């Protein structure tokens, strides 16, 4: 008999969670249901769960996810990215993403790839909060969410735009690494043939637990598939339900439709985006560029960077002892992220309270042939 992934914790699992808390103090602010989700995703493997949770907490801190509701996304994302949070027949959240309706080329000429990814993570975090609220109501240790992608109006740009392909792939990787056992189902509706071919081509990067959740019904069956998981009387008519809001079948108070070509007034001119920069360097193929910083008191490390072509990796390391000779011996405080940054600069910051040596790494080690010309600004200010 199959056991539900959201079943109550066994006595062994409860003890394992206590043991995890004793050696991973970083998870003190995570509830038991949250930790249980990770433990079950790792099939009870203690060391793997502990290491994954440490990395996850570092990721959440670096991306400021615990304060994501305080983040103000770029106006362009709010205006043109359609999504909404609804519920299934049992009141569990459904995140609807109107991915097909997005002008991906215009969007990524207007906002940083980091902000597009963060905007998507913010929606996922909202869904997670709703799951936690539902778990309190249901008495289960945690709840799961359904993700619906509507590909209506999808164009060849979704597959040919290099910046979007890179950003979306990064988003998928981050989701798989940091939101295990979070989804009940992934429903992809109104998918044309080219989308089905594209999906087949990306299955190589999808982990098996994710691929098992994916359902891509035919054009004639997608409404039926939705009807199996939602109350049609509480579901917008535009997506197969019976609900109309003030004559509008899209129910705009529930789903932000977005869409349309991004106005050129939002476009960033790459030649002017970083007219004032402190440093210019070339990171050769197979090489890295390292910047060492001495932090003497609690500080905020801020950065802005962009390349003249393609992507570049970025990571921040902390040398606890002050005597490490290799990056691999240091503690990662900002996890590695590889982003397209040719059109719009990447901007970010990290607050650090531990004094000592920090190393900012720009990585082009993965490239066999292409050198990257890199412009960047680094600032340090007291907290």
From Swiss-Prot:
Any one biological process term the GO annotation gives: regulation of basement membrane organization
CRAL-TRIO domain: residues covered: 73-247
Stretches assigned to the GOLD domain: 271-380
Effect of loss of the gene: RNAi-mediated knockdown in cells of the pi uterine cell lineage impairs basement membrane (BM) sliding along each other and reduces the size of BM openings.
SMART domains: SEC14 (SM00516)
Domain of life from the UniProt record: Eukaryota
Keyword match Mitochondrion: no
Keywords associated with the record: Cytoplasm
Primary residence: cytoplasm
Pfam families for this protein: CRAL_TRIO
Subcellular location: Cytoplasm, Cytosol
UniProt keyword annotation of Nucleotide-binding present: no
Disulfide bonds listed in the record: none
InterPro entries: CRAL-TRIO_dom, CRAL-TRIO_dom_sf, CRAL/TRIO_N_dom_sf, GOLD_dom, GOLD_dom_sf, SEC14/CRAL-TRIO_domain
Tissue: Highly expressed in cells of the pi uterine cell lineage.
GO cellular component: cytoplasm; cytosol
Function: Vesicle trafficking protein. Functions in uterine cells to promote basement membrane (BM) mobility and BM gap formation during tissue remodeling.
PANTHER family recorded: SEC14 RELATED PROTEIN, SEC14-LIKE PROTEIN 2
The name this protein goes by in its record: Protein ctg-1
Organism from which the protein derives: Caenorhabditis elegans
UniProt gene name: ctg-1
């Amino acid at each position: 008999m199959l056991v539900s992934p959201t079943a109550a914790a066994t006595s062994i699992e409860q003890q394992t969670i206590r043991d995890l808390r004793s050696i991973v103090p970083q998870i003190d602010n995570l509830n038991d249901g949250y930790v249980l989700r990770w433990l079950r995703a790792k099939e009870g493997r203690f060391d793997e769960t502990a290491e994954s949770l440490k990395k996850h907490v570092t990721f959440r801190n670096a991306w400021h996810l615990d304060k994501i509701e305080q983040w103000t996304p770029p106006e362009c994302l709010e205006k043109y990215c359609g999504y909404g949070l609804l519920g299934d027949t049992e009141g569990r959240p459904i995140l609807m993403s109107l991915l097909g309706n997005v002008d991906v080329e215009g969007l990524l000429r207007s906002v940083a790839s980091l902000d597009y990814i963060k905007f998507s993570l913010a929606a996922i975090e909202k869904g997670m909060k709703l799951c936690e609220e539902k778990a309190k109501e249901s008495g289960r240790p945690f709840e799961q969410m359904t993700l619906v992608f509507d590909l209506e109006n999808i164009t060849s740009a979704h597959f040919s735009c290099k910046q979007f392909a890179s950003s979306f792939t990064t988003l998928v990787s981050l989701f798989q690494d940091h939101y295990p056992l979070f989804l009940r189902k992934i429903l992809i509706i109104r998918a044309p043939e080219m989308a089905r071919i594209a999906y087949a081509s990306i299955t190589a990067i999808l982990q098996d637990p994710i691929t098992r959740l994916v359902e891509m019904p035919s054009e004639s069956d997608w409404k039926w598939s939705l009807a199996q998981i939602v109350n049609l009387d509480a579901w917008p008519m535009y997506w197969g339900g019976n609900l109309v809001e003030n004559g509008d079948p899209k129910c705009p108070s529930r789903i932000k439709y977005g869409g349309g070509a991004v106005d050129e007034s939002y476009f960033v001119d790459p030649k002017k985006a970083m007219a004032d920069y402190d440093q210019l360097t070339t990171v050769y193929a197979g090489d890295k560029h390292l910047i060492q910083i001495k932090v003497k008191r609690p500080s905020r490390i801020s950065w802005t960077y962009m390349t003249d072509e393609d992507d570049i990796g970025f990571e921040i390391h902390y040398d606890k002892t002050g005597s490490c000779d290799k990056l691999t011996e240091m503690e990662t405080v900002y996890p590695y992220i590889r982003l397209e940054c040719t059109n719009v600069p990447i901007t970010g910051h990290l607050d650090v309270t531990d004094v000592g040596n920090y190393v900012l790494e720009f990585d082009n080690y993965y490239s066999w042939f292409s050198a990257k010309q890199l412009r960047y600004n680094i600032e340090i200010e007291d907290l």
